[in-house]
Amino acid sequence: GIIEDLIQFGMEKLVLFGTCGVLDQDIEATSIIIPTSALRDEGTSYHYLPASDEVEVNKGIIPLFQSFLDSHKVSYQKGKVWTTDAPYRETIGKMKRRKESGAICVDMECSAVAALAAFRGFELCHFFYAADHLSEEKWDIRTLSSHSDLDSKDRIADLAIQFALFWEKAD
């Protein structure tokens, strides 16, 4: 709802970042992940786009964002995200299937926001920082819901603001 309101107020570009759970233990906490596509395992995106298994994310913005991160000497990974609105149904079986489909992380809104961006025609730069780790054995909360590694989290928020300013000037 908030993004729809922002569109009505004239928003044309959106930089959105937040946490994600990683499906690969080698992805360190607070690592930046740039989603390239999202597996649609939620309901909202289907109100904006026809049914499909995936939706493209960050259409057209990835090269500019990568260049920005490179110029700031910030490492990142690109990959597919699994979006679900049912976190307590992130079962071992589903997680294995999503990993087999290429997902490296899981979040709760990426596919819905990407569908909204495609439908409403605004530009989107969506990225994550790794928080918890999901595996077949157990859930590792890492830095999710804690005050640990606040300096890295502050740096990521600052990067989002700096990229928004950079992106505005790039046009």
Which positions does each model-derived feature cover?
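His/Asp/Glu-rich mid-to-C-terminal helical/loop segments that flank catalytic regions of hydrolases
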Residues: 134-171
